[in-house]
Amino acid sequence: IKAFAAETGVTCRCFNKIGLFFKGGVNNRNHSKSAVIDGVKGYVGGVNVGDEYFGEDLRCGIWKDGGMSYEGRAVNALTEGFFTAYDFGRRKKERYERYLNRAKPAADGGELRTFVSAPTRGVSRLAEVYKTLVYNAKKSVVISTPYLIPDDGVSSALAAAAARGVEVSVVIPGIPDKKTVYAVTLSVAEKLKKRGVNVLKYKKGFIHAKNTAVDGRYAVCGSGNLDYRSMYLHFETGVFVKSAKLAKTVERDILKDAAPYEEKAAGVKGKLLKVFAPMM
């Protein structure tokens, strides 16, 4: 990182750096993937900066990811979330008011809200977004996630939706990037299947997108996985949009190249590893 900063002139900071006088939680990591350009355009999603994200590493087959760009004052939450992480653990805080978008909301703009989920806020915004959407779903819930290790609250919400007749579909990778975590994902998938949730696999390889579509009306895109770490340990960013056009596009994209999951879970291994799910 130091070499990159010196070569490019980009200011870089290590988040929650572990050192001799390290005080932060070792599991509290910045998992957000976001960018704000000139305070006008924001980007969120699952895309990191790495070879696999640009199709140059095919060990997991095709690596599918997702993201969303948008403009307007809603990007301010991304800017605020960035500086929350940028200043984490520091006494002196950066002043970021000059980076904020001052434009008036568009009169014909759809409903769009940026959310930041952080362990420092006491409540998991990510978990609340999932539970609120799923508990209020009337017809369908379609989710893509690379890791399926939700807490009991989200698991119960998914099962309850399926029980009341909502078509609940979750797409997981066909080829894993981490075999140990995948064993837990398969174990959870088996349990959710028994409770009426339709679990599918991305046929072409590894799906890293964290997208959701509900009732063909609401869409969510961001960095948060459907797992314990993203919900309670990591800093995450995402965007909620009320738009039938966008929601249907997201739903089609999630289900594209997805096939029914028929594989058996990793037996005792998966069940035992689930005990360590919060640390995975």
Model-assigned labels for residue ranges:
Residues 1-280:
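Charged, low-complexity intrinsically disordered terminal segments
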